[in-house]
A protein has these predicted regions:
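PLP-dependent class I/II
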Residues: 1-130
Length: 130
């Protein structure tokens, strides 16, 4: 199918312009990277602190990406139940851990690729429903 052909070419035949852009990004100024690292570190600390303050929730500090994956078993809800509750009652989108396999039960994934203000608002909304 067409999608397969596109994927094969996209994954194995990266065009020259994209390759040159990648080189420029790697060899160019890195000050933006340092700024992003600091911003994501602050957001990570914020969300982990807020998650650990929620009743029945326990979150270790993630070491990569921009996702927190707290244990929610203390809430008495399944991952799917809590995902739905947060979306429907608090307007906060998360991903049930079971979306990543059966061993994800008891966990919900949060993204902290958002502003600190958005994270604060989301955590406040969740605190109001738990």
């Amino acid at each position: 199918p067409l999608a397969t052909k596109l994927a094969v070419n996209d994954h194995s035949c990266v065009n020259a312009a994209t390759q040159w852009a990648g080189i420029a990004a790697l060899e160019g100024p890195q000050d933006a990277v340092d700024e992003m690292v600091r911003a994501f570190d602050a957001r990570r600390k914020l969300i982990v602190g807020k998650l650990n303050a929620l009743p029945g929730v326990s979150c270790v500090t993630p070491l990569g990406a921009f996702y927190a994956f707290p244990n929610i078993t203390g809430t008495g809800k399944t991952a799917g139940e809590l995902q739905d509750l947060m979306l429907n009652e608090a307007g906060v989108a998360t991903v049930a851990g079971t979306s990543f396999g059966a061993l994800g039960e008891g966990y919900v994934r949060f993204s902290y690729a958002a502003s600190a203000a958005q994270i604060e608002e989301a955590m406040s909304r969740i605190a109001n429903i738990l």
